[in-house]
Design a protein with these regions (language model features):
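Conserved recognition-core residues within compact binding domains
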Residues: 1-80, 85-115
Length: 115
């Protein structure tokens, strides 16, 4: 059985490559838990809806993976998750890094110039 590892949400486990599992909680129709179907937002970001205290929260898979598996050297400064290959569908922890908004924009411009 997988341990809960998503901060602030009981019953959820995120893998290093961005797959989300929820274990069975009372009143749930799933006997043993389930792997969640991920969806794409209008901006081509992979999202999922997690529930806490009966309320749903739409969260980015990249943020969840980064919160659990990617070290943030300065949480008060680095609040944005950057995709190192600029592919928002690649949510493997090795492709994610914490940074500032300006760092993220600079990286995107640099990558576009290289192509």
């Amino acid at each position: 059985m997988m341990e809960d590892n998503v901060p602030g949400f009981i019953g959820y486990h995120i893998t290093r490559d961005g797959k989300l599992y929820s274990r069975r909680i009372e009143r749930s129709p799933y006997k043993f838990g389930k792997w969640h179907k991920l969806r794409l937002s209008k901006k081509a970001r992979v999202k999922v809806k997690l529930y806490k205290d009966g309320r749903g929260y739409n969260l980015s898979i990249s943020r969840l993976v980064a919160l659990v598996y990617v070290y943030n050297p300065n949480p008060s400064k680095f609040k944005e998750v950057m995709h190192l290959d600029n592919n928002p569908l690649n949510n493997n922890y090795k492709n994610l890094q914490w940074g500032t908004h300006s760092m993220n924009i600079q990286q995107m411009i640099f990558e576009q110039r290289r192509r």
